[in-house]
Curated annotation (Swiss-Prot):
Entry's family note: Belongs to the TPP enzyme family. MenD subfamily.
Keyword line: Magnesium, Manganese, Menaquinone biosynthesis, Metal-binding, Thiamine pyrophosphate, Transferase
NCBIfam families hit by this protein: menD (TIGR00173)
Catalyzed reactions: isochorismate + 2-oxoglutarate + H(+) = 5-enolpyruvoyl-6-hydroxy-2-succinyl-cyclohex-3-ene-1-carboxylate + CO2
EC number: 2.2.1.9
One Pfam family here: TPP_enzyme_N
Keyword Isomerase: no
Keyword Metal-binding part of the UniProt annotation: yes
GO BP annotations listed: menaquinone biosynthetic process
Encoding gene per record: menD
GO molecular function list: 2-succinyl-5-enolpyruvyl-6-hydroxy-3-cyclohexene-1-carboxylic-acid synthase activity; magnesium ion binding; manganese ion binding; thiamine pyrophosphate binding
The protein's name: 2-succinyl-5-enolpyruvyl-6-hydroxy-3-cyclohexene-1-carboxylate synthase
Cofactor: Mg(2+); Mn(2+); thiamine diphosphate
Amino acid sequence: MPDARAADEPAQRLPRTGNPATDYALALLAHLIGAGVRDIVVSPGSRSQALALAAAELERAGAVRLHVRLDERVGGFLALGIGRETGAPAAVVTTSGTATANLHPAVLEAHESGVPLIVITADRPPELRGIRSSQTTHQDGLYGVAVRLAKDVPAPSGEEEDVATAARLAVESVRAAVGAETADPGPVHLNLAFREPLSVAVPPLPVVERGALPALAGAQKLGRETVVPGIGPSTVVIAGADAGPEAEEYARSAGFPLLAEVSSGSRFGPNLVVAYRELLREPEFGGRVRRAVVFGHPTLSREVPALLLRDDVETVVVAPRGRQAYNPGRRAVIVGAVRPAVEADPRSPEARAWVGLWVSASRRLVEAAERVASPDATAPDLAKARSLDPSDALAFARMELAAVRAPITRPLLAEALWRHTWPHDRLVLGASRLIRDADRIVPGKRLRVHSNRGLAGIDGTIATAIGVALASQAVAVETGTLPGITRVLLGDLALLHDAGALLGGSGEAWPNVQVIVGNDGGGTIFDGLEVATIASPAAFDRVLYTPQRGDIAALSTAYGWAHRVVRTKGELDQALSAPPAGASVLEVPLER
């Protein structure tokens, strides 16, 4: 922990207004910035006005990026998206009352995903609590075990010690959010009481120093060591959500097949097995596995937990951060890191045969699935294209035209989106049926993929994507690198559930973000569950499939987003290859 006196010094350089709320708010936010915070999200409110006005002046001074959102739930997920992309906590500021509860979904997702986040809620002072004061509820401890640090901060009194206390609290909060001492990053809750007068005008600010983020503590803080699994028995590497490139590197260097989910950040490399679900069900593949090394949080299949529940499969879970680790059988060995055995040789005949068995079988299955999904698709006949015979040229043109006019299916949509996304872009996948379609077919490609798989809810998907877009594109501008586009793939229900995220203030900057919605008229993800076979059609449609009356085109226009409907493969490819142009919605009608 930094020395308290060092934390006090910048506070003395801030202007003093004589208003306790304003002076405290300035000190707290300035020191959050000094500890590594780069983004503040504000929702309007009276009790939090000192924080909001201080944030505006800090943005004017060039110290921070400010984002204003009317809906606190949207603001929470926006901050979550920023934290996902940067690894730095964004601070989200709300007033008291129900505003604080609207942050709870984002807090829970940040908790389960290990995303740093700082929640700052304004509150009444003690004398106004418990007497039915307006817009007052019990906010202390509101988020329970989901936060890494919770502080109920007394109302500042205007004493000199107030700003020093705020400075220390800011440093402590950032360190808790990033897991500097615990290796357990996640949300922090600061509940700040303010007495009237709630603010005064903020004078011009001096230069506010922007500090570096503290480093994440090592896995040894969790008592997890680095282990070296041997070269046998028959081993696979499983990469779930947020596993990152480390899973691919280990699988390749150790000579093991890589079963990587589309949201893992590990879905690339020569050892990748795309059709892992089908192969895990087969005795000659899944039945031969005797050890699994797991990275990240697998959530997209039933076959993976079924494998790890088997008594004859040894499970090693790599969890360098977070108190909880994925452990469906409750008997996995939880470690901080893995290294290939010294004797491991990925080029050995045994390793090549084991990996090759999985990779080649996966390739055959994917090709077969593509033929089923697009039975009319054929490879271009280049001989006809080069032929001088007019009939050959005409036949080739007809084939190409048929391919362009092909209707869009879910696999085709997922494949096209994946193909048109580049490493400098960002891809956000919602908790809809489409993420599973993508997981079944898209090939290896090193992309930055985000998905809220901590709790896998459909809420907040668009807001998260906008946060990812704002953060990634701001960093690109600052570093002089090529800014990409952020695309989010989701279903119609997920879009309608987060429709408020499409709303932005007239003074807010909007990034290049494209929302691609597969509109199949409801929750078709339930069609593949057991409930579809036992419920009556009428009851199933009403309470699970839940078709909505929403008009996505009208909704997009009302909120100022460009909207386009695409129905064919050619239209889809054209829309995805067009240069980024602000905020847009691409609606793709799909059959149920």
